[in-house]
Regions:
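Active-site neighborhoods and metal-handling regions in enzymes and metal-associated proteins
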Residues: 1-391
Length: 391
């Protein structure tokens, strides 16, 4: 039995679930594709991962020749009537099962089971629960090698960040201005020099360009950076090794010798909200279950108390793993875009990145957190003060 199958069984036992039921059509389910292999499967496939007995596969007769797996007892259907009859027989003893759903469908990354399949199970009198925590447990835990890769990516990323702000200073002092796109390209070139992977170029945004959280400059659309401007740099990268973990950070600077009071005031709101999130994790992770939405609430409530809640227009943080993009598939720190009721468990990583996006300028502060032995470990550095770029 593979490690992943052992992990599923262990999770079912620990959480008193009879089974995890997964569906796939034309290899759409990435977990089943990983377990069964990348076979040419063209019809609906059911996988029944059982707690107390062997696992079952229910496959169409056309797909059966391509499915040879000793970890499953295989059942074959020809017609849809046979498919439903066999499924009904397989689940008749279940009382509590996990399926790839989220409450009200608010977490799209795990809401992949279709209405009819879920409804069929419920119509047999079976309680259906979200597999979200199981999928985090299976797919988003970071091993020691992955953690070391994340540390190294963060170390290099933070150094390149320093170089980028230094270049802005040099540009302004030498010619009177810098340029968003030029700094973006400077960072991307440094990534290439250090053999780092990034899916998209970094965000370099000045003043109210930074009021759009996903603004980024292009060669044909870029703004100059002058003395007195507020500068946001959001940058993400990872090592090119297999299964390496992303670094994703955002830092703020002001192109002057000193930071203005208004900029400092807003930044301190963001900094303090992150401090409260980390304190909450320190206080409660070892005592009880902590969910992604709860950390978002801690951050958002503080920002609301300071009068900036309508300017904080996205979730507090996202899962970080080895995916193509820095946005992983695990628990997000979110009670705004979604209500993420997935648990924060050991060996996962996520960002904390609250923002305040007003008409004059936008701000965001972002670091990366790894959970080790129920303790939040800051991997992405912490910005304590806005950088006075010209100092």
């Amino acid at each position: 039995m593979s490690k992943k199958l052992e992990d599923i069984k262990e999770y079912l036992i620990k959480n008193n679930m009879d089974a995890y039921i997964a569906f796939s059509y034309e290899n759409s389910n990435t977990l089943l594709k990983e377990i069964l292999g990348k076979h040419f499967l063209t019809r609906k496939v059911f996988a029944f991962f059982n707690r107390d007995k062997e696992n079952y596969l229910l496959v169409n007769q056309l797909d059966y020749p391509f499915v040879k797996d000793s970890d499953f007892k295989i059942f074959v259907y020809k017609t849809y009537q046979e498919m439903l009859a066999l499924e009904k027989e397989m689940i008749k003893d279940y009382k509590r099962v996990l399926v790839d759903i989220s409450e009200d469908g608010v977490i799209p990354s795990i809401s992949t089971a279709d209405y009819g399949s879920v409804n069929f199970i419920r119509n047999q009198g079976i309680e259906v629960f979200s597999s979200g925590d199981l999928l985090t447990y299976l797919n988003c835990r970071i091993d020691e090698k992955g953690f070391l890769s994340m540390q190294e990516a963060c170390r290099i990323n933070l150094h390149i960040k320093d170089l980028a702000f230094e270049k802005i200073k040099e540009d302004i002092l030498s010619r009177g201005y810098s340029d968003e796109y030029e700094i973006q390209k400077f960072i991307a070139d440094k990534y290439e020099e250090n053999d780092l992977f990034f899916d998209e170029p970094p965000i370099v945004a000045v003043n109210n360009n930074a009021s759009n959280p996903h603004y980024f400059p292009t060669v044909n659309s870029s703004r100059k950076i002058y003395r007195g401007d507020v500068v946001l740099i959001d940058m993400w990268c990872k090592l090119k090794n297999k299964d390496s973990i992303y670094s994703d950070i955002t830092w703020m600077g002001e192109a002057d010798e000193n930071v203005s009071l208004n900029v400092e005031k807003r930044f301190n709101v963001l900094k303090n909200s992150i401090d409260l999130a980390l304190l909450y994790l320190h206080d409660y992770l070892s005592k009880r279950d902590v969910y992604g939405y709860q950390i978002d609430d801690v951050v958002r409530n503080y920002i609301r108390d300071k009068g900036y809640d309508k300017y904080f227009i996205h979730r507090t943080g996202h899962s970080i793993f080895s995916d193509l993009s820095p946005h992983g598939k695990g628990v997000n720190i979110d009670d705004y875009e979604t209500r993420d009721e997935r648990r924060i468990i050991n060996d996962i990583a996520f960002s904390l990145e609250p923002g305040i996006y007003m008409d004059d300028f936008g701000m965001r502060s972002e670091t990366d957190v790894f959970i080790h032995d129920n303790v939040p470990v800051i991997v992405g550095g912490r910005q304590e003060k806005v950088i006075p770029i010209l100092k």
